[in-house]
From Swiss-Prot:
This is Formate-dependent phosphoribosylglycinamide formyltransferase. Disulfide bonds: none annotated. ATP binds at R115, K156, E196, E197, F198, V199, E204. Homodimer. SUPFAM superfamilies: Glutathione synthetase ATP-binding domain-like, PreATP-grasp domain. Belongs to the PurK/PurT family. Residues 120-316 form the ATP-grasp domain.
Length: 402
């Protein structure tokens, strides 16, 4: 457990280097700055959100081994914080061997980026419930795997996020095409796909769970789950609310799954464990991110400490007694409709007239269709009231050319 904090930009400072500098990273940087940490923000493009609040910034290809290693060795940070999936994980493994602290650890980052390795860990090693699944190395194996798990089946790249490369297949022909799409749209190099049972989803939860140093050892703490919803045909986060509107039995099962998976991954910091609640009553592990989760943006309004504050404290080796859920809250993303450079946000005044509403405008340098440009947050006496407020405010906003 850490007892001393230094001063940024002096020889006493603790230094954090973010690999990925999006909107989630920006909130982490703000929390680190509050603790006097010197922060370096790295991303594949300039003027990314977290770069706006960091002390220094670098633009590199984060999938390139040498570029990742070079920027870390140049800055020599006390902690490396991966904020996105598109990172060369072999570089992180080797940097950890050199003595650098990777959050939560290089093994966890590498496993969670790979759907096949993650499913093996969760279902086969830890033994938590998941959908039926099989792995495919070619088009014919994808068709055979769909026969095994049953049609319709979901085909996903070994490495991807936010629905990229997903196909719902109802025939062997569609399964073969789905495999080709999975490889084409994978993030990074991918030669395999995972084929999963298609389930009718009733609810989707994020079981935010963190590990911190209490001074007497590492403790794992599950938080009240966040619930989120994606309109039909949309795979990315669109709207979330907190606490989840599910019964206590589902909450307990979700927390139990999350704790088991997170303990196996180890390290320090917060994890976003994605849970599916099916219409036939099953509570299933889906995926996990070893970092703050986009659906957890709602905790900026709902909790005593947001997921970002928790992450910042935990990765610095500071204790984080379980924070309170202060109020029901909801979030809704602000999406762009077209490519614009630079983009501006119109309708802000009217949106902020809605009681209980806050806005985070990420100030990304350019937009494209359906790019997440901001998020609205709202509190209320109930989740339903918070959702009504955030949806009403969203109706006023539009991303436009400046």
């Amino acid at each position: 457990m850490r007892e001393v904090l230094g001063t940024a930009l002096t020889s006493s400072s603790q230094k954090a280097l973010l690999l990925g500098s999006g909107e989630l990273g920006k909130e982490v940087v703000i929390e680190l700055q509050r603790l006097g940490v010197e922060v370096v923000a790295v991303d594949r493009y300039d003027r990314a959100p977290a770069m706006h609040v960091a002390h220094r910034r670098y633009v590199i290809d984060m999938l390139d081994y040498d570029q990742v290693v070079d920027v870390v060795r140049r800055e020599r940070p006390d902690v490396i914080i991966p904020e996105v999936e598109a990172i060369n994980t072999d570089a992180l493994v080797d940097l950890e061997k050199e003595g650098y602290f990777v959050v939560p650890n290089a093994r966890a980052v590498k496993i969670t980026m790979n759907r096949i390795e993650l499913r093996r860990l969760a279902a086969e090693k830890v033994g938590v419930p998941t959908t039926r699944y099989a792995f495919a190395h070619n088009e014919d194996e994808a068709a055979e795997a769909c026969e095994k798990v049953g049609y319709p089946c979901l085909i996903k790249p070994e490495m991807s996020s936010s629905g990229h490369g997903h196909t719902l297949a109802s025939s062997p022909e569609e399964a073969r095409e789905g495999f080709k799409r999975a490889l084409k749209e994978a993030r990074g190099k991918s030669e395999r796909a995972i084929v999963e049972e298609f389930v009718e989803i009733d609810r989707e939860l994020t079981a935010l769970t963190y590990r911190h140093d209490t001074g007497n050892g590492i403790e794992t703490v599950p938080l009240p789950p966040v619930e989120h919803k994606r309109p039909k045909g949309i795979y990315y986060y669109y709207e979330s609310w907190h606490p989840a509107t599910v019964n206590d039995e589902v909450v307990k099962k979700a927390k139990d799954i999350a704790v088991k998976v997170v303990n196996e991954l180890g390290g320090l910091g917060i994890f976003g464990v994605e849970i599916l609640v099916t219409k036939d009553g099953r509570v299933l592990f889906s995926e996990v991110s070893p970092r703050p989760h986009d659906t957890g943006l709602v905790t900026l309004a709902s909790m005593e400490l947001s997921e970002f504050a928790i992450h910042a404290r935990a990765v610095l080796g500071l204790p984080v007694p379980e924070p309170k859920l202060l109020t029901p809250a909801a979030s809704r993303v602000v999406l762009a409709e077209e490519a614009l450079e630079p983009p501006c946000l119109k309708g802000v005044g009217e949106a902020l007239k809605v009681k209980g509403v806050q806005l985070r405008w990420f100030a990304k340098p350019r937009s494209y269709k359906e790019r997440r440009m901001g998020v609205l947050l709202a509190t209320g006496s109930t989740v339903e009231e918070a959702l009504e407020r955030v949806r009403r405010a969203a109706g006023f906003l539009k991303v436009v050319k400046c």
